[in-house]
Amino acid sequence: MQVPRLKLLMGSGAMFVFAIIYGWVIFPKILKFMISKQVTLKPGTDVRELWSNTPFPLHFYIYVFNVTNPDEVSEGAKPRLQEVGPFVFDEWKDKYDLEDDVVEDTVSFNMRNTFIFNPKETLPLTGEEEIILPHPIMQPGGISVQREKAAMMELVSKGLSIVFPDAKAFLKAKFMDLFFRGINVDCSSEEFSAKALCTVFYTGEVKQAKQVNQTHFLFSFMGQANHSDAGRFTVCRGVKNNKKLGKVVKFADETEQDIWPDGECNTFMGTDSTVFAPGLKKEDGLWAFTPDLCRSLGAYYQHKSSYHGMPSMRYTLDMGDIRADEKLHCFCEDPEDLDTCPPKGTMNLAACVGGPLMASMPHFYLADPKLIADVDGLNPNEKDHAVYIDFELMSGTPFQAAKRLQFNLDMEPVEGIEPMKNLPKLIMPMFWVEEGVHLNKTYTNLVKYTLFLGLKINSVLRWSLITFSLVGLMFSAYLFYHKSDSLDITSILKENNKVDDVTSTKEPLPPTNPKQSTTVHPVQVPNTLIPGTNPATNPATHLKMEHRERY
């Protein structure tokens, strides 16, 4: 029976081509198509439900820089800072008043963040610790008036002395009062200067202040924003074009901002940071619009990583160097004058929040070294202060992330306000926050068993097919190689069979008498084609064998 060499060759070749095309072309396209149909913000989908009401809290950490030498700093000395924290909160995110536009393939919603103190995770801290910070109303207010409304300085200075009697440049208060419960602002005075100062509270210009009665307000960094509207977004649903999933097209019902000098900086780029499109390329980066900064920030690919045994991509970001990057000059006060640009690694938030605040990475990580040298107590490092995201590109899933941001006061002396006239000019760290998420196995298993299991099966299948096809190709090549020698091999086999037949037909020799001497003569065998079997040339055939009887 002959082996079908041609069929084996063709079958193995076809298997090899199929493994390549299916494993690297067809299957990935099928998988991407299935993901694109599932990962949308269409009502009724699992992704829509998870996106609109996150079923687990994010971890929110607050670290405060306690000023240990406030009196010396008030006289121009170098600040000494002590980091206190973390104060831990559970941050719940939800979206309400959702409105779909099927024609535009968008959904509009209001974002709401709710912070709940986690005393167990905060231990040994309690939140009742007293912290010394730059006065959160006097210093920003005095600096803003000096820069923008210097003619009103005398009126403001008198009003501050009435609303905050005996106030100093630095305020000592409990952490929870500073950040959530609020510090008291007394606007009960009938003095004209006090009433003029309190106007900004009554009109709502001070967004961090909450009115508790007709004459009193409570000011806190985050209390007013807790469980309140964080802005109305309009984003793409990704039904018609999956690549636009989550893309911000409007914020506060505007298609672009009107904050920065140049239009490019006012453009919305990326998502609302709670959802990303699947199938991104690593060089695309991860872009998100951040209302707190009135700016879109992009994270860039750093290196490969893994999370719970699943491969992912590590992304990171920083504030960049606005002065050195021409594309970022629109974040300068005057894009034509680079001297108005903030230092490397910082961003001026005055146009965004209306006060002399600067944003940076914690501890001025990746910022101008001079900023670190201006104060004592900072120790920037990548592990604790870098922003990172471990992201799975195909499904668009962030496995874990840490968004870190530091808020600083752009401090300077104010001649018209007595407690502030000798302050040093520097960028003063106040506090920094970290918003983190680490998906547990309940959610990572959804990706693991729907995506990575399919990828693993495809990998095993395609490499198995390639292995079998290569074995088949090698075996068929072996058969074709020996095809030219088949005649010689057949002849040899036939002659071997002839020799066996001749040997089997010989008559047996008569038994020898042990008492007689016997001479054995060789039998003449016809010459064969097998070399070495010709008796005429074999010396063994001339040997004479004798048996003698022993007595």
From Swiss-Prot:
One of its GO terms (cellular component) is cilium. Disulfide bonds join 265-330, 294-352, 332-341. Residues 528-551 are annotated as: Disordered. Keywords: Cell membrane, Disulfide bond, Glycoprotein, Membrane, Olfaction, Receptor, Sensory transduction, Transmembrane, Transmembrane helix. Its main location: membrane. It is found in: Cell membrane. Coiled coil: none annotated. Residues 29-459 are extracellular. The chain crosses the membrane at residues 8-28, 460-480. It is a multi-pass membrane protein. It holds the Pfam family CD36. Residues 1-7, 481-551 are cytoplasmic. Belongs to the CD36 family. Plays an olfactory role that is not restricted to pheromone sensitivity. PANTHER family: SCAVENGER RECEPTOR CLASS B TYPE-1 SR-B1, SENSORY NEURON MEMBRANE PROTEIN 1. This is Sensory neuron membrane protein 1. It comes from Drosophila erecta. The lineage of its organism: Eukaryota, Metazoa, Ecdysozoa, Arthropoda, Hexapoda.
